[in-house]
Amino acid sequence: MHTIDVIDSHTAGEPTRVVLAGFPDLGDGDLAQCRERFRSDFDHWRSAIACEPRGSDTMVGALLLPPRDPSACTGVIFFNNVGYLGMCGHGTIGVVRTLAELGRIAPGQHRIETPVGTVGVALADDGTVSIDNVESYRHAAGVEVDVPGHGRVRGDVAWGGNWFFITEQAPCALGLAQQRELTAYTEAIRLALEAAGITGEAGGEIDHIEISGVAPDGSGAARNFVLCPGLAYDRSPCGTGTSAKLACLAADGKLAEGERWLQQGILGSAFEGSYRHSGRGIAPRISGHAFITARSQLLIDPADPFAWGIVA
């Protein structure tokens, strides 16, 4: 019987499962190399943690590892029900909240190492977590793709720690009641991008689709709908998606450096974003809250036919 110690949380409605102990040794090397060993040798552990019956299509796992960067308080590899993430904004907020729950960090400035770079984080006394995300940028503007049943859809391809196609063309209101229609629409966009050979830089797969609009509550905030790689919609405003959106706004001159941007997700929960100029794009800062929902041990019984998860 294998046991895996985890702490679960949610960030603006989106779950994170932090893996504390019980995972196989991924060896030496940087975190990108560890992620590749995770993928090649231990992918069944990913599905055991993130997939049903223990997880779900919304679950993001966060495996804590000793950092290679001496300035970081921890290393982390993010994963979900279908694969691996370079960075995860809501997941990082969940990791910081979990580290605080464990007494491993106090309010103040910290750094967390990911496979795509080390990010700065700040934990405030009231529990607000702010992330200085990886450098984000717009790769291509005004990209058009023919989407069966919807015609030509225009959007930007941007990096915020993952690759996004961001469009303002929505088939309906951006509300929870419309999530099925929005999911079908964004999945159709993703398939059309793949069929057309449209990618991020160096052939990077565009595995997140984001619809951007105005919040319906009259607050002046923005609202988005984000389709994640496993074809589940993001319950949160999506930290990497908000970073990618900020990069596009900055490139278009629609948001000034340091100006506050309030980004709602499909549930109406919000992240606050801002940026400073950096290199080829921007250095985004995303702020939000996470809440602990469970401390538990996952049990993997070799006799269980679904010990390593239900995988399509």
Curated annotation (Swiss-Prot):
UniProt xrefs under PANTHER family: TRANS-3-HYDROXY-L-PROLINE DEHYDRATASE
Function summary: Catalyzes the epimerization of trans-4-hydroxy-L-proline (t4LHyp) to cis-4-hydroxy-D-proline (c4DHyp). Is likely involved in a degradation pathway that converts t4LHyp to alpha-ketoglutarate. Can also catalyze the epimerization of trans-3-hydroxy-L-proline (t3LHyp) to cis-3-hydroxy-D-proline (c3DHyp), albeit with 500-fold lower efficiency. Displays no proline racemase activity.
UniProt superkingdom: Bacteria
Residues reported to bind substrate: 89-90, 208, 234, 239-240
GO molecular function ontology, one term from the record: 4-hydroxyproline epimerase activity
Main enzyme class: isomerase
Similarity comment: Belongs to the proline racemase family.
Species annotation: Xanthomonas campestris pv. campestris (strain ATCC 33913 / DSM 3586 / NCPPB 528 / LMG 568 / P 25)
Keyword Repeat: no
Keywords, comma-separated and alphabetical: Isomerase
Identification of the protein by name: 4-hydroxyproline 2-epimerase
Known catalytic reactions: trans-4-hydroxy-L-proline = cis-4-hydroxy-D-proline
Ranges that cross the membrane: none
List of catalytic residues: 88, 238
Enzyme Commission number(s): 5.1.1.8
Keyword Isomerase among UniProt keywords: yes
Disulfide bonds: none
